[in-house]
């Protein structure tokens, strides 16, 4: 009962015939190409290993679960190629495993890879929903480069192509960090969202989240949750490309993760994939951001273990 994450982890390779039954599986995406294309502050390539370092000494509370690590996919020059390779690793982990798969970023371009991983792992008819904790919609149109600002526009285009509904919710969006054009596109694409200001009202925020998400959760088979670390106040998450002046509370996100794990049976969806994006150790102070990322991952694992 005295084990910590670093004592529990098995390093595995994609493609081996591993039994990952009841495992939590980590997959890193070393990329800041999308951040660079988005004209942001680079450094998120070192994010996955910084998060691992912060996870290493956390206690392991789930005696029946194993921990696997599939290592990192690195984006050197070709972002789309690296996203496909990372998507293959996510797809492999989801197919080999019935536990939670966790993507470690890397810039938020990780999200396009994560989505493709779920899409490829599931039957064509599976309805996928995305919940993004983020100060930004990330619904920009690729022009022509894709970036850390385009992943959910890419998902929207993919849904149009496959004639499937676009189920996307963004929690913590900042009016001061998204243009009117992005708000217009969010509205025409039926993006569900709550602003950072709306989520800073502690007495009402969980009720608002329930009202926003429940209709979507009823309509999906698979849930993918992505946390962009710039959703949090700069004092708590300085190690990101675009620090937030306001941000939302980590406790709110943790409560929502537990809400999402709990409602799987109520609404009949599965939550199997979570990623954490925009970890940039170059700008971190006292590993604050890495420790926050690790705590959120710990809580996602705890939420799913408690409600499965």
Please identify what each model-predicted range represents.
Residues 1-28, 33-308:
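Conserved alpha-helical scaffold segments that buttress catalytic/binding sites
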């Amino acid at each position: 009962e005295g084990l910590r994450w670093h004592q529990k982890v098995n390093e595995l390779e994609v493609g081996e015939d591993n039994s990952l039954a009841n495992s939590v599986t980590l997959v890193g995406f070393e990329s800041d190409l999308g951040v660079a294309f988005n004209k942001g502050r680079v450094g998120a390539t070192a994010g996955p290993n910084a998060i691992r370092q912060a996870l290493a000494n956390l206690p392991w509370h789930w005696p029946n679960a194993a921990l696997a690590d599939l290592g990192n996919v690195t984006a050197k020059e070709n972002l789309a190629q690296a996203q496909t390779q990372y998507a293959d690793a996510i797809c492999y982990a989801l197919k080999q495993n019935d536990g939670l798969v966790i993507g470690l970023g890397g810039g938020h371009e990780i999200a396009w890879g994560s989505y493709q991983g779920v899409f490829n792992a599931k039957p064509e008819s599976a309805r996928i929903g995305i919940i993004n904790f983020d100060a930004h919609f990330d619904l920009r149109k690729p022009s022509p480069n894709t970036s850390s600002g385009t992943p959910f526009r890419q998902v929207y285009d993919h849904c149009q192509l496959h004639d499937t509904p676009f189920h996307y919710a963004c929690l913590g969006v900042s009016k001061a960090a998204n243009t009117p054009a992005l708000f217009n596109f969010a509205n025409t694409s039926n993006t569900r969202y709550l602003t950072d200001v709306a989520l800073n009202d502690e007495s009402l925020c969980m009720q608002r989240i329930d009202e926003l998400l429940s209709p979507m959760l009823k309509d999906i088979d698979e849930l993918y949750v992505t946390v962009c670390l710039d959703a949090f106040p700069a004092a708590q998450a300085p190690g990101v490309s675009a620090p937030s002046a306001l941000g939302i509370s980590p406790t709110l996100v943790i409560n929502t993760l537990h809400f999402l794990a709990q409602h799987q049976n109520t609404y009949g969806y599965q939550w199997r994939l979570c990623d954490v994006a925009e970890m940039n150790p170059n700008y971190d102070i006292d590993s604050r951001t890495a420790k926050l990322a690790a705590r959120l991952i710990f809580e996602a694992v705890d939420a799913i273990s408690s409600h499965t």
